[in-house]
Amino acid sequence: ANSLMLVNREAQPANQPPPGVAGGLGIYDVSSPSRPREITFWRCGGAGVHRFTFDGRYAYISPEMDGYVGNIVMILDLADPSRPQEVGRWWMPGQWVAGGETPSWSGRAHRCHHPIRLGDRLYVSYWHGGFVILDVEDLSKPRFVSGLDWSPPFITPTHTALPVPFPLHGRRVMLAADEDVAKLAPGSPSFLWLVDITDERRPVPFASFQVSGIDGSPQPEFTGCHQPCEKITGTEIPVAWFAHGLRIVDIAAPHAPREVAHFLPAVPEGHSRVCSNDVWVDDRGLLYLIDRGRGLHILERV
């Protein structure tokens, strides 16, 4: 957006960065796409920034910050991309240990995965803390509206909280994708939820979608749901479904979501199975499906 490209940098336990390489957010000028130029690098503490969304001016990010346990919500103003300015932040009570708070959970189980903005609300996935809805009418003071945490009893963490930008049968609906990793116990793969947020103070899960052939028996991680396309153009939602490839789910009848198309890539060389990680759609309707191991497929709906 606005000829800017943002790239998160994050240290992973299995792939520690070399000395001197920090986590944060890289900001690039891509007005000449073949010659991207780094404008600046915004640094943060801990492992860095896990994921983000960007509307052309504000970046809604999930950084680790000194004094906090796990990633928090932060809003950066990139009006001057050479000087990113923090506008506001929010964290789940218990994360700010430097401020005297004590988490009610162990480790980094409750942490911001990433925020998605629609209007004056942020819809924030919070891993094993479920999801929260924040009022950002005043960007400097994000305010808690509501939240819902279903793990436990469900065993997988929430990866994406994605509001549908149009009503379905007169109701406001949010999609919630749980990620098939970091399970609280052995169990069946994660799936996609539909949540009624017509009364946003009282979100109500009312439907779900799981791929066919799942019988409830325990499966390895990276089998189930991961990420829905965060650009919604209609009721057909492309979803990256790890070992099951790309699934296109029609939510036109929200109480009965159904699969209308799918694509299973070939297993990448050097890997034992498919691991479809992310999917995006461009203005032409082309789909871009990335494998977590290696490879990119460009697809069209027929």
Cite the ranges covered by each PLM segment.
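Feature marking well-ordered beta-strand scaffolds used for ligand recognition
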Residues: 1-302
